[in-house]
Amino acid sequence: MRAVVLNGHGGPEVLTFADIAVPQPGPEEVVVQVRATSLNRADLLQRMGFYPDPFPGEHEVPGMEFSGRVTAMGTRVRAWNVGDEVMGIVSGGAYAEQLVV
């Protein structure tokens, strides 16, 4: 799966495309195929190193707001169905083709 990732902190040059693992939902999570995301002040501050990275690690995928469609569900999910259109705010990860919430 493709995502925009941070390779350090700085200007726009630290943003690159990368192939990362396809997310798998836990029992109470859904996978969302991201159809739209946004750029906000927190994303800019994170890129510049002035905002804590929500999930430091091998791939830091920024992005907080998203909208899309549910493509997979955990075994205990009851409020959503595959195909439902959803939107939300996460602490990071919305600049990917899919995310788990």
In which residue ranges do the predicted regions lie?
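Short beta-strand-to-turn element immediately C-terminal to the catalytic PLP-Schiff-base lysine
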Residues: 6, 47, 71-72, 100-101
